[in-house]
Regions:
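Mixed-charge (Asp/Glu-Lys/Arg
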Residues: 1-173
Length: 173
């Protein structure tokens, strides 16, 4: 029987460490972890191939490049809709930080993974998981405000973003 882990009870640092541990398990020893303190929006980075499908081999679901992993822990969980709203705001702020002219984030990733304890609805199209994924695709391709329409996260090199949500993180633990 599957067990639910109360991930919201972890300290912020412990949740970041869990994020790094999961990255090491999934991606291997090429993961570079960052310690406490300012991390430029990165808990860990990885450069290389990422196969998201354990059954199909390296293919359409695969990534190959510079990946940033970020932990997004919600201390008090709400309804799936509240959790989705919170996570949409968190992810949007991260994209805004990468786009800021005065950003101190350094190298823009080709891929980004948001690891969160937020439990989201899996209802097709309307659920939080699909909302986050659609928002990520839209933000990556959307023109930067005030640009001539040619500047976007995609134009700067970001190819995809993925969320590992509460129910998935709990299964991986």
């Amino acid at each position: 029987m599957a067990q639910d882990y109360p991930l919201e009870e972890l300290s912020p640092r412990a949740f970041e460490q869990l994020t790094v541990a999961l990255a090491l398990k999934v991606l291997g020893h090429g993961v570079e972890a960052f310690g406490s303190g300012p991390d430029g929006g990165r808990e860990a980075t990885y450069t290389g191939p990422v196969n998201w499908s354990a059954t199909t081999g390296f293919g359409a679901d695969s990534w190959d490049g510079y990946v940033v992993l970020q932990a997004k822990q919600k201390e008090t969980l709400g309804t799936p809709a509240q959790n989705a709203s919170w996570l949409l705001k968190q992810v949007s702020e991260e994209f805004d930080s990468w786009l800021a002219n005065d950003s101190k984030r350094g190298r823009l990733p080709q891929y980004i993974v948001f690891v969160t304890n937020a439990r989201l609805s899996s209802v097709a199209d309307a659920g939080g998981i699909d909302q986050i994924n659609a928002s990520n695709r839209q933000r990556i391709s959307a023109p930067v405000p005030g640009s001539d329409g040619k500047d976007s996260l995609a134009a700067r090199g970001l190819r995809a973003a993925k969320g590992l949500f509460g129910h998935l993180v709990g299964v991986m633990v």
